[in-house]
A protein has these predicted regions:
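Catalytic core of carbohydrate-active enzymes
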Residues: 1-173
Length: 177
């Protein structure tokens, strides 16, 4: 919930929709120009709904490394994929250089997003800096988390309300400890 709510807050301030066409995020990729069967949910999550009874879905992943949100399967972008999904699954991928805030309450959408938040760190590339914001119920910043990777050293910092916060490294490799 924290990620979706923050994307809604961003949408309120910028006018850029939370659920957007692929070309809005990848304007320099000609393959995204006419994609109408998949979309970006915010700036980090790609969703390719299943529209066929048999569960076959064809989708395109733009350049980069993409990690399936639920299974953790890693795929390289810049190519098309054709797969079969059942009623309980669909292609939902998180792009590299993403910090994804996952809430700790599955019962309600009305809770303190920063309390016990899980920050999933997705493949931060060497030389990159990325961040995420966790909002409070009024849309103000409750927590900011930043990741910087230099010389294969990944540094994670947080500022704000970070009670019981935890980091989960997803598809993060070649990091010195």
């Amino acid at each position: 919930m924290p990620y979706i709510y923050q994307m809604a807050v961003n949408s309120h301030h910028t006018g850029i929709p939370t659920m957007r066409s692929m070309v809005m995020e990848f304007e320099n990729d000609p393959a995204t120009k006419y994609l109408d069967m998949q979309y970006m949910l915010g700036d980090s999550i790609l969703v390719a709904p299943v529209f066929s009874k048999d569960g076959d879905v064809e989708y395109y992943l733009p350049e980069g490394t993409w990690t399936h949100l639920l299974s953790g399967e890693v795929k390289q972008g810049g190519r098309w994929y054709k797969e079969n999904y059942d009623f309980m699954s669909l292609p939902v991928y998180v792009r590299d250089n993403t910090l994804l805030a996952i809430g700790n309450n599955e019962e309600t959408a009305d809770y303190d997003f920063a309390d016990g938040v899980e920050i999933r760190v997705y493949e931060v590339n060497n030389g990159c800096k990325t961040s995420c914001t966790v909002p409070d119920q009024k849309g103000h910043t409750a927590l900011t988390v930043e990741a910087v990777r230099e010389n294969n050293k990944l540094t994670l910092t947080s500022n704000g309300k970070n009670q019981n916060m935890r980091y989960v490294l997803e598809n993060v490799s070649n990091v010195a400890t």
